[in-house]
């Protein structure tokens, strides 16, 4: 992404027309997929020696331990204060390269003038706080009001790892577009007549208000397999204290936020033991969660591209997409915007992280403040 001296992203070449694959193979394909289309090429590997497997498991354990910032300290002592001061310094240095979207709001406004904004939002950790029980990740009424307000001014979509139905139950706003299961289950607008032809995997449907929408589910052939794996994993981890399963329709989440750290390795071992018989599925990690997904070339970044095209905003020089998210899975969306120089990402984090987002905010409270400022600017400028 090109930068001005004021550290604002400059939109260069527009995004090329999205060329989506036209066919999806069934999940029964045994071990590999063609190099073209949605499927990732994953030839069957020879078994690795025990030592290498131990290293691989150790690497996953490190990721699991590092996947979420530590809990706030309940007591004060000198060592903790020194550590906090060091982290504070690291964060201040990090913000130089990923400036606050609030303190840099004028730069964002200057960039947005004369452009049509499209807003993409993660849910957990972005619109709602991260909580011990994922079923309790409820957004506040004030946040819902802020999201409703911006959605009345800009096309707005929620792109979440949760199932689409579940995230809608949390948000409860019909003004939005929803992409669940990391973009593998999208309810988007019916394409404009001047855009490219209807994608073959889109299903014409209606939403809860009777409005015509398109459903796009590129991993639909995997549903029987995902359901089967969910049952096996539920049985496998049921005796690990604190482990929790979540069925997100096109992916399965194994939450270990409430698991004792000494049991992290056991969680990983049991999950991988089940998955070894499913080469068409892959394991990824997020914030205190292991996620099982189909091996297809689809993610939140692809979902952003799909929605932009569905909205008739793809390849337009006067369009500015903004993506706000907090998790590793949101990096796919940040990368798409950065690589194509068409917009920018805002990372929600109070600790320094490697990211392709240009701006940052600390927490959902700052996300809400940013949304309110964005809505106020739009109304004042029209």
UniProtKB/Swiss-Prot annotation:
InterPro entries recorded: HAD-like_sf, HAD-SF_hydro_IIB, HAD_sf, OTSB-like, Trehalose_PPase
Enzyme Commission code(s) on record: 3.1.3.12
Keyword Phosphoprotein: no
Organism, as annotated: Oryza sativa subsp. japonica
Pfam families: Trehalose_PPase
Keyword Hydrolase part of the UniProt annotation: yes
Tissues where the protein occurs: Expressed in roots and shoots.
GO biological process, one term: trehalose biosynthetic process
Pathway: Glycan biosynthesis; trehalose biosynthesis
Induction conditions: By cold, drought, salt stress and abscisic acid (ABA).
CDD domains xref list: HAD_TPP
Protein's name in the database: Probable trehalose-phosphate phosphatase 2
Disulfide bonds: none
Alphabetic keyword roster: Hydrolase, Stress response
Catalyzed reactions: alpha,alpha-trehalose 6-phosphate + H2O = alpha,alpha-trehalose + phosphate
Noted pH dependence of activity: Optimum pH is 6.5.
Main enzyme class: hydrolase
Family to which this protein belongs: Belongs to the trehalose phosphatase family.
Cofactor: a divalent metal cation
A Gene Ontology molecular function term of the record: trehalose-phosphatase activity
């Amino acid at each position: 992404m090109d930068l001005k001296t004021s550290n604002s992203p400059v939109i260069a070449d527009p995004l090329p027309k999205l060329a989506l694959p036209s066919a999806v193979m069934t999940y029964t394909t045994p071990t590999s997929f063609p190099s073209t289309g949605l499927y990732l090429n994953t030839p069957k590997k020879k078994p690795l020696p025990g030592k290498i497997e131990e290293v691989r498991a150790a690497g996953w354990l490190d990721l699991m331990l590092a996947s979420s910032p530590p809990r706030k300290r309940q007591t004060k002592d000198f060592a903790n204060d020194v550590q906090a001061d060091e982290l504070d310094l690291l964060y201040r240095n990090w913000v130089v390269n990923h400036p606050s979207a609030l303190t840099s709001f004028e730069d964002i406004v200057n960039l947005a003038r004369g452009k049509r904004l499209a807003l993409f939002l993660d849910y957990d950790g972005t619109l709602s706080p991260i909580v011990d029980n994922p079923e309790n990740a409820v957004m506040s009424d004030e946040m819902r009001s802020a999201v409703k307000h911006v959605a009345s001014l800009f096309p707005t979509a929620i792109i979440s790892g949760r199932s689409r139905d579940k995230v809608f139950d949390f948000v409860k706003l019909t003004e939005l577009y929803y992409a669940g299961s990391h973009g593998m289950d999208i309810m988007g607008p019916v394409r404009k007549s001047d855009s490219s032809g209807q994608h073959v995997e889109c299903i014409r449907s209606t939403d809860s208000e009777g409005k015509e929408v398109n459903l796009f589910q590129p991993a639909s052939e995997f549903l029987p397999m995902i359901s089967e794996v969910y049952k096996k994993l539920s049985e496998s981890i049921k005796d690990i204290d604190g482990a929790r399963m979540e069925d997100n329709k096109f992916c399965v989440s194994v939450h270990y936020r409430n698991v004792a750290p000494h049991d992290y390795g056991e969680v990983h071992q049991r999950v991988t033991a089940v998955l070894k018989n499913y080469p068409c599925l892959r394991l990824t990690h997020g914030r205190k969660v292991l996620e099982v997904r189909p091996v297809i070339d689809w993610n939140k970044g692809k979902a952003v591209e799909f929605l932009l095209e569905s909205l008739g905003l793809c390849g337009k020089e006067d369009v500015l997409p903004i993506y706000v998210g907090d998790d590793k899975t949101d990096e796919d969306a940040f990368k798409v915007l950065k690589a194509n120089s068409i917009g920018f990402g805002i990372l929600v984090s109070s600790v320094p992280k490697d990211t392709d987002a240009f701006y940052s905010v600390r927490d959902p409270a700052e996300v809400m403040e940013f949304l309110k400022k964005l809505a106020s600017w739009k109304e004042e400028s029209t």
